[in-house]
Amino acid sequence: MYKKLEKCLKSIREKTDFKPEKAVILGSGLGDYAEKIKREKIVKYTEIEGFPVSTVQGHKGQFVFGYVKDVPVVLMQGRVHYYEGYSMQDVVLPTRLMGMMGAKKVLLTNAAGGVNPSFRPGDFMLITDHITTAVPSPLIGPNIEELGTRFPDMSEVYSKKLQDIIRKSAKDCGIPLQEGVYVQLTGPNYETPAEIRMVRSWGADAVGMSTACEAMAARHMGMEVCGISCITNMAAGVSDAKLNHAEVQETADRVAKDFEKLVTDVITAI
């Protein structure tokens, strides 16, 4: 796997020598943020040898290199998911690659279902911790010694220091911020009401199909991690509404301006 990472990095370096300080993964419906930054270079996933390609509507499938204010960043405009048929090692390959490019901190964003009944569609949730019991760990298999230790500590996946910065950014921007635990399930189907009752009993506040595995891979290689979920719908059984992907995009569009404001402030502050 490390050789594959090196090959992907070489492929990118043939196209740009841009060195990001921070990385951002843009979730479903949130990819338009990449159009708002000062862009220096775009590298499509299809241009990178051996790179997994996103197939989901609302995920463009490219790295965007550029600046948020004066901060050099790399944005993933579209991620790959386990449910697309990729191995978990391939799912986290882009995260690891951004770390190898030079990014020391990563902001993970996603569209998520609200499990906590006090949440509402359009809320932002600071991810304080996660549950990945239902999906394979990206660290299964031979350990990549060049990246990190065999048995990494996960007692603080999401940096408490960065969490405090996000809280301050939200307050400064006048944007209400929920907080909670994110649980990653496999997808692509939405969850049943019984499954939602189960994860709520585990302590989950939001549910989705990505992010936690990327956070684990990033922490394994020593990156500082923070995360924000956009609650685009209430999970099955929490409300009577039927679930569909169009609703995810509609809610993300509705809060796009607040998302842009919050993410810009966070990137410059972390």
Give, region by region, the residue ranges found by the protein language model.
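Non-catalytic positions within long, well-ordered alpha-helices that form the structural scaffold/packing
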Residues: 98-102, 200, 219
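Short acidic/polar active-site loop segments enriched in Thr and Asp
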Residues: 104, 205, 224
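Polyanion-binding loop/helix "lid" in catalytic or ligand-binding cores
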Residues: 147-158, 184, 196, 252-264
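Active-site/ligand-binding-proximal alpha/beta "capping" segment
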Residues: 163, 169-205, 263
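Zn-dependent metallopeptidase/amidohydrolase metal-coordination segment
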Residues: 209-247
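His/Asp/Glu-rich mid-to-C-terminal helical/loop segments that flank catalytic regions of hydrolases
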Residues: 236-270
